[in-house]
Amino acid sequence: MMIRLRRAIDSAVTQLEEAGIGSARCDAEQLAAHLAGTDRGRLALLDTPGEEFFRRYSDAVAARSRRVPLQHLIGTVSFGPVVLHVGPDVFIPRPETEAILAWVMAQRLPERPVIVDACTGSGALAVALAHHRPAARVIGIDDSDSALDYARRNAEGTAVECVRADVTTPALLPELDGCVDLFVANPPYVPDDPVVQSILEPEVTQYDPRHAVFGGPDGMALTADIVGLAGRWLRPGGLFAVEHDDSTSVPTLDLVYRTDLFDDVLTHRDLAGRPRFVTARRRESWSA
């Protein structure tokens, strides 16, 4: 790596650390690699960039120090096996949600399963699952036109169907009743509470769409509707997974149990050891 570029990155690391960013070194190198059109691991092989690079790099580092998300600045985020386009009008997929993806990949599904991803946002789960199961019919549902614009772009080259719909709508998509093999959901679930908001990172409170983050006072505004859809859409033996706040694991479990429609109801932890999602299997009998 050329001396001037190394010094610019080191200076950026200091600037980002002073802004309270814990991943300062990673972010500084990611920004440099993005602007240079290379991978982070190949920065050392670069020839000396021109003045335009250093001007743009300075601007990008300044934006990141204002806590503009790294993903907004580079325009993409990795999620499991795929790279997704993201921006200011869509929720940035988090590594925690990859735990659901890993769980699904370990399950047995029919050869051509029907998969629904509710609150799909950028299409993260839908697109990743379509790559994992290319013969599947995958439906991504969201009520945000902006989010679906990203989802459709990310779904190019796959069979993912993007549907604009509100999961709270009564009798939503009755044609799916009893036909779905796998239903996953990552709804907005952060409690809309001043105490909770005070501990969130600025990247969340200032840049993620509120509609995609906060799930009402207790974070569960959509959970009951999603559990109800799972009970209606899943075929007997179909699989269900819903992500939740680490403070609402027990209430989410209770919602699923109380339907009396599911077996094998389990809670799962994320990589940090926090309870993060609940899974269940639709009972073989349709009787409650």
Swiss-Prot record:
GO terms for biological process: methylation. Substrate binds at N186, P187, P188, Y189. InterPro entries: HemK-like, Methyltransf_25, N5-glutamine_MTase, PrmC_N, RF_methyltr_PrmC, SAM-dependent_MTases_sf. One of its GO terms (molecular function) is protein-glutamine N-methyltransferase activity. Keywords: Methyltransferase, S-adenosyl-L-methionine, Transferase. It comes from the Bacteria. This is Release factor glutamine methyltransferase. S-adenosyl-L-methionine binds at D142, N186. The gene is prmC. Belongs to the protein N5-glutamine methyltransferase family. PrmC subfamily. It is an enzyme of class 2 (transferase). PANTHER family: HEMK METHYLTRANSFERASE (PTHR18895), MTRF1L RELEASE FACTOR GLUTAMINE METHYLTRANSFERASE (PTHR18895:SF74). Coiled coil: none annotated. The keyword S-adenosyl-L-methionine applies. It catalyses: L-glutaminyl-[peptide chain release factor] + S-adenosyl-L-methionine = N(5)-methyl-L-glutaminyl-[peptide chain release factor] + S-adenosyl-L-homocysteine + H(+). It comes from Mycobacterium leprae (strain TN). The keyword Thylakoid does not apply. Methylates the class 1 translation termination release factors RF1/PrfA and RF2/PrfB on the glutamine residue of the universally conserved GGQ motif. Its EC number is 2.1.1.297.
